[in-house]
C-alpha cells in the first residue's frame, strides 16, 4: 500500500473543490475512503463527497492485451456518493465499450479482490489434484480432460502456482482485517506458493539421473502474450 499512500500524498495539495480523484490500484476494502480520502482531507480540509468527488474503479486488464481489455471489459465503479460514481461513469464511457456498473467504494474494492481470489482458489484446486493423482499413480491431465467433459465442470490445468504481482497478493487483502484462520483462501495460497518448490524438486530428481546434466528451464505465466514471470531462479538454485 506504500505506493497508494505515496501517490495520495503527492496529489493531496493539488486537489481543489470540484475535482475528481479515482483510484484503480487493487486495494483492501476501505482504502479509498479511509486512506486516500483522509490524506486529502487532512491536507486540504476538503471533504470527499461534499467538496470533491472520490471513486474507485478496479483495473481489469491482461498484460499483453492492455489496450484491448481497457476498452472492451465491463467496469465496476464505486463512489463515495452517487454523484462521484456518476461523474466517474461519464469519464469511463468516453473509452470503455463494455458495460459500467455503479456501486459503493468498498463493494468495488472487494469485487476486484474476489475476482483474483477466485482464480487463485481454482488454480490451487488443479494443483492439489495433481499432487493427489501423483500419490495414486494417475495421470492428472487425463483426469481433468475427462472431468471437463461434464457440461458444468471446467477444471484448470495444474502448473507452477501463481505468477504476477496481483493474484498472489490479493487474497491476503481479503483476510487481513477479518481475523479468520485456516480458511480455504489461506490454504489455496499455501498450495500455490509451494508449487514452484515441488516442481523444482521433481526436476532435480530427473536431472540427477543423468551425468553432467545441462538444464535451461523457464516457466512463463503468460506465454501467449510474451509476458514472462520467471521461476528460473528457484529451479536453477535447486538443481545446482
Specify the residue positions occupied by each region the protein language model found.
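Structural/interface elements that position substrates and couple domains in central-metabolism enzymes
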Residues: 1-240
Amino acid at each position: 500500500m506504500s505506493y497508494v499512500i505515496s501517490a495520495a500524498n503527492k496529489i493531496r495539495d493539488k486537489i481543489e473543490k470540484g475535482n475528481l480523484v479515482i483510484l484503480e490500484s487493487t486495494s483492501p476494502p476501505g482504502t479509498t475512503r479511509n486512506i486516500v480520502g483522509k490524506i486529502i482531507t487532512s491536507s486540504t480540509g476538503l471533504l470527499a463527497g461534499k467538496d470533491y468527488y472520490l471513486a474507485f474503479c478496479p483495473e481489469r486488464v491482461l498484460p499483453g492485451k492492455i489496450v484491448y481489455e481497457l476498452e472492451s471489459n465491463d467496469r465496476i465503479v464505486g463512489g463515495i456518493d452517487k454523484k462521484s460514481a456518476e461523474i466517474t461513469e461519464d469519464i469511463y464511457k468516453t473509452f470503455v465499450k463494455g458495460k459500467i456498473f455503479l456501486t459503493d467504494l468498498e463493494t468495488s474494492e472487494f469485487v476486484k479482490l474476489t475476482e483474483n481470489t477466485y482464480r487463485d482458489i481454482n488454480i490451487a484446486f488443479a494443483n492439489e489434484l495433481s499432487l493427489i493423482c501423483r500419490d495414486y499413480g494417475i495421470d492428472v491431465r487425463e483426469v481433468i480432460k475427462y472431468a471437463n467433459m461434464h457440461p458444468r465442470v471446467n477444471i484448470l490445468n495444474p502448473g507452477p502456482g501463481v505468477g504476477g504481482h496481483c493474484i498472489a497478493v490479493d487474497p491476503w487483502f481479503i483476510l487481513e482485517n477479518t481475523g479468520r484462520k485456516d480458511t480455504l483462501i489461506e490454504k489455496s495460497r499455501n498450495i500455490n506458493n509451494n508449487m514452484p518448490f515441488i516442481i523444482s524438486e521433481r526436476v532435480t530428481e530427473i536431472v540427477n539421473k543423468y551425468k553432467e546434466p545441462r538444464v535451461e528451464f523457464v516457466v512463463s505465466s503468460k506465454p501467449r502474450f510474451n509476458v514472462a514471470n520467471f521461476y528460473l531462479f528457484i529451479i536453477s538454485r535447486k538443481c545446482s
